[in-house]
Amino acid sequence: MNTNHFLKADVPIAKRKIESAEELSIMLSEALRDGDYEEAISLAGSIKVLTEDISRLANKGRLYETALKMQQQGINLTVVSRCIG
């Protein structure tokens, strides 16, 4: 499991989600083999949610790395929040 794209604080969370997705994929394979398609649909949905969360965590890490590289090149970055009104 490659955790290079995650922030240090997110690594344990990402590992836990990846392990859960792997376990669910084994269960999904078994459900398909047994012909339990309702269970397979449920498991596939859970895997989708977990992988979306993992992707968001990885994107957050890549964004941080990109911001650091930009700052090293002399680009001044600030956080801008917008009002939702």
UniProtKB/Swiss-Prot annotation:
Effect of substituting K17E: Loss of interaction with DnaA but not Spo0A, partially prevents toxic effects of ectopic overexpression during normal growth and sporulation
InterPro entries registered for this protein in UniProt = YqaH-like
Keyword match Repressor:
no
Specify whether Methyltransferase is a keyword of the entry. Answer: no
Pfam families, alphabetized: YqaH
The consequence of E38K is: Loss of interaction with DnaA but not Spo0A
Which terms are listed as keywords in the entry?
A: DNA replication, DNA replication inhibitor
- Effect upon mutating K48E: Loss of interaction with DnaA but not Spo0A
The organism's place on the tree of life at top rank: Bacteria
Q: Add the further remark from the entry.
A: Part of the prophage-like skin element which is not expressed during exponential growth. The element can be excised during sporulation, leading to possible expression of this protein.
Q: How does this chain assemble?
A: Interacts with domain IV of DnaA and with Spo0A.
Protein's job: Binds to and counteracts DnaA replication initiation activity; overexpression decreases the number of replication initiation events. Also antagonizes DnaA's transcriptional regulation activity. Ectopic expression during exponential phase stops cell growth 2 hours after induction, leading to filamentation, aberrant chromosome segregation and septoid-trapped nucleoids. Overexpression during sporulation onset leads to dramatic reductions in spore formation.
What name does this protein carry? Answer: Small protein YqaH
The species this protein belongs to is Bacillus subtilis (strain 168)
